[in-house]
Amino acid sequence: PLTFVDTDISAEQAAFNRAQPNIAFLSQSGAMMAVVARSLADRALPLSFAVSTGNEAASTIEDYLEYALQEPSTRVLALFAESFRHPQRLLAAARRAQELGKLMVLLHPGKSSAARESAATHTGAMAGDYAVMRTKVERAGVAFDERLEELCDIAELALR
């Protein structure tokens, strides 16, 4: 299921957001998408869009990441992902983001066995080896963070 968050902005504000550098937020959790979108809005940071891919039965975070890379005003790609269905596409998108001068920042909650079990029950995702995943995405140029606040802080610093 695809979920968009109501960012409580007018048509004028949406046009203003598109006219300046902004943040795209992609999440596999609808609740996290809403929390982060609200946090970024509270910091007066413009969002190009915030989308939740849910259990990814029809579309994946990689699909929206590839779309976000094509948006000229999107300068920061912030992700909350429990797993990646297409890791090679993710890594290719990360390299493309670097080429375009866009920062990709990732919060991945699968560090502990409890987090991996939670991901499996939440979205049906199978989280792989955390250390291997982290090494690969960092080598591809992705900024990795450990906490939700860091995700918002890094996105804000990169945008300003």
Set out the residue ranges of the language-model regions.
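Catalytic-core regions of core metabolic enzymes
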Residues: P1-R160
